[in-house]
Swiss-Prot record:
Native species: Cupriavidus pinatubonensis (strain JMP 134 / LMG 1197)
Catalyzed reactions: RNA(n) + a ribonucleoside 5'-triphosphate = RNA(n+1) + diphosphate
Domain of life of the organism encoding this protein: Bacteria
Protein's UniProt name: DNA-directed RNA polymerase subunit alpha
GO function term, MF aspect, one: protein dimerization activity
Amino acid sequence: MQTALLKPKIIAVEPLGDHHAKVVMEPFERGYGHTLGNALRRVLLSSMVGYAPTEVTIAGVVHEYSTIDGVQEDVVNLLLNLKGVVFKLHNRDEVTVSLRKDGEGIVTAADIELPHDVEIINPNHVIAHLSAGGKLDMQIKVEQGRGYVPGNVRKFGDESSKVIGRIVLDASFSPVRRVSYAVESARVEQRTDLDKLVMNIETDGVISPEEAIRQSARILVDQLSVFAALEGTESAAEAASSRAPQIDPILLRPVDDLELTVRSANCLKAENIYYIGDLIQRTENELLKTPNLGRKSLNEIKEVLASRGLTLGMKLENWPPAGLDK
């Protein structure tokens, strides 16, 4: 009797529009379509890294319930429009940008002054309408994050939010706008009881639907890897004789699994950093002393580690473990 579980062999991506695609995977054993589809959907909606405006300072405005002379929108609607601007930061976690415009006309996202490593995905997005003599002068803080973070959460923990005139925003960081899935019937040879998983994904353009699927799958694999390494319960005598700290299996993976750029990966290997466990024990200052590894590569490494719940400068006991090849 065959006991091996089927793995999907067909993965098709059908574009449905800008930043919108249908991803089809088959065949799955019966029931696995719903099991994996629901898990992927929840991760896609909650755990993708994105960018959002988190704080705003507007010249002449003390609080969000104000109005601005010469601006059609009140401050509440102005902030709602601002939340619709899709930012993408390269090799940085936060940035403060400026928006200054006067005179009659429409204010769009393209009017925001950006540094070279920040881009706006939807530059035609309308922020406000100015009448003759109207003027708008704003400072906008944009940060990287996950999921949805209410503004009042940061108000209690951030002293900077107490500055008069600084408005703290609710931040929706997720780059995934909508996700749905359906499970249909699939057939392989004589078997007709198999599942086909169809996922419909729409993003804001910061990442593609295909990349969103890849990232969500990696997150699930990382979270489940600890269960794959689970061992049976030890007896009291065995527990007493094996008190060495257990090592997270993620740390035993080669740095190649982080999918860094070729430049960053080669710099790490030149310093004999072959495993993720080797990497996280290095500090930022130590890595910056590595030949050809600059601030851009360092930020890339920090971002990739953060997506896996890791940071630089961590301390590990019992490293390297016995039998680890270099």
